[in-house]
Amino acid sequence: MSRKQHTHGAKVDNPGKMLGRLLNYVMKQYKFHIAAVVIFIFVSVLANVQGTMFTKTLIDQYILPLLKAETPDFTPLALAIGKVACFYAIGVGSTYAYNRIMIYVSQGTLRNLRNDMFARMETLPVKYFDTHPHGDIMSIYTNDIDTLRQMISQSMPQMLSSVITIVSVLISMIILNIPLTVLTLIMVFVMLSVSRRLAAQSGKYFLEQQQNIGKVNGYIEEMMEGQKVVKVFCHEEESLEKFNELNDALFESADNANKFANILMPTVAQLGNISYVFCAIFGGILAINGFGGFTLGGLASFLTFNKSFNMPINQVSQQFNSIVMALAGAKRIFDLLDENPETDEGYVTLVNVREENGMLKESKKRTGRWAWKHYHKADNTTDYIELKGDMVLDGVDFGYNPDKIVLHDVKMYATPGQKIAFVGSTGAGKTTITNLLNRFYDIQDGKIRYDGINVNKIKKADLRRSMGIVLQDTNLFTATVMENIRYGNLDATDEDVIAAAKLANADGFIRRLPDGYHTMLHGNGSNLRQGQRQLLSIARAAVADPPVLILDEATSSIDTRTEKLVQDGMDKLMEGRTTFVIAHRLSTVRNSDCIMVLEQGRIIERGSHDELIAQKGKYYQLYNG
């Protein structure tokens, strides 16, 4: 039940490169939107800076003269205040505009990422899903995507706004008073030093937090799938203990990450307040003494700029942790996008054919006859080899890891219409052989031929389309019964679906459902019994009308009464088809043309049921065990 924990990377080795890749991804789709955002940020910052700068003029030229006037005229002051209000109104409007655009950009980017991730996921080999916890993959779609949303919609515009604000305010402070600017920069240097130390600590723990979230999600998903097994073997306490272990690790990393992040902001804020106090004291002395023409209005503007200067630095410090966490998520996302898709060097395709003058000709219409279209580049000719279902495994060696071979020198010959059964202990390699027939995995040595063609030459989609598979675990989708059966052949008509259901003896129970064939199934068909779910899986294989049928534990989960119903339908389905059967109930394979007994990846016995019983070997032991 356990799946190998496979993380997407422990750390972001090059944050700058990862940030650049993310920005490039965003810009590729939304460069004009980003350009508009930059313009609005510039307008917003400059409007606020201009409004603050005008405070000096407002005090020195409007307010102070009014204090000395015997009959003050407030009209010029009102006009000046109106001018300041216009500056700030422009700033507010621009801020709203760029925030609104960034929300659109962030949601659009996340939509594109989800589309790209799902499209890439559909191209990945089965091996990827066998080695990555499903909960960890789900965590990429949920948690990591959400951290990117926060970064793109909030952190990125705030960082850009902060940088522009820092530059604009610094220039304004230099214009107002150089000594006070130097004092401010000294305090900023102290703030940055403290921020860097704290951010480095929190960044490390944020990366751990992302990985631990994936592990917790993966374990929850695993336990949900295997809850019946957990209860049957009374493993509730062990499962809880393991979960507490993973949850405690998540708590530790999250606690440490947020501990340093929460210390960072108030520390930087207090240092900013100290900077403000120092500038107020020193600036007050300069203004009172009129040093360098420094005025009370200049001091008021400078102190406002001091706050404006410290605020973006605080924001940069605050957003730094969010960006570090988002980059950790971005790495996991891009790791998924960078996964190598399933390779397919096949060039032989499956096509509809018709017979003309004793020759097979390709047909664009569905004819009910199929052939392999084999193009020979050397002499520019094309052969059409009729699809019959002849399968040969010749000296096949295979290992899920190249250094650990699990199948050794497997030889097997299946002529069209034969029923071949694989039996053996758990782990003997029965299911592995079926994984090789449809090329979920590729062999290390030997050859597999299908109708005389090396399967490596056949396009994987066409190879798999020619095979009907009934897996041990029945997967049903959130759709109607009709649509779930039609999944085996999307071109099938309603009549084809019903005929397939009748063949699998599923028609009776389907018609007793509330809406018959239009009954909606949810939660992997949780509203059906196990036997009914298995019958739908068999009907799905039947509607594909394949020449080769693979039954992996097809009846191992069905009760005896249902099994009798299935067996009759399966016997009809297997007529004229090459069928490979894997079953622990050896009674279901007695009528096989050939039974192959596997042990530790080797075929140790082969023959009919009667022949193997007479040998009194491994099969005899299994049958009478």
Provide a role label for each language-model segment.
Residues 1-48, 63-84, 98-102, 106, ...:
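Membrane-integrated ABC transporters
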Residues 70-71, 353-625:
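ABC-type nucleotide-binding domain
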Residues 117, 121, 230, 333, ...:
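Helix-loop junctions and hydrophobic alpha-helical segments within the transmembrane domains
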Residues 65, 172-186, 256, 260-331, ...:
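Helix-loop-helix
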Residues 8-16, 40, 47-60, 86-134, ...:
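Juxtamembrane helix-loop junctions of ABC transporter transmembrane domains
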Residues 28-31, 126-127, 145-152, 156, ...:
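An intracellular "coupling" helix at the cytosolic face of ABC transporter transmembrane type-1 domains
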Residues 29, 33-46, 84-87, 154-208, ...:
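Transmembrane helices of ABC transporter permease
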Residues 20, 39, 94, 98, ...:
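Hydrophobic alpha-helical transmembrane segments of ABC transporter permease domains
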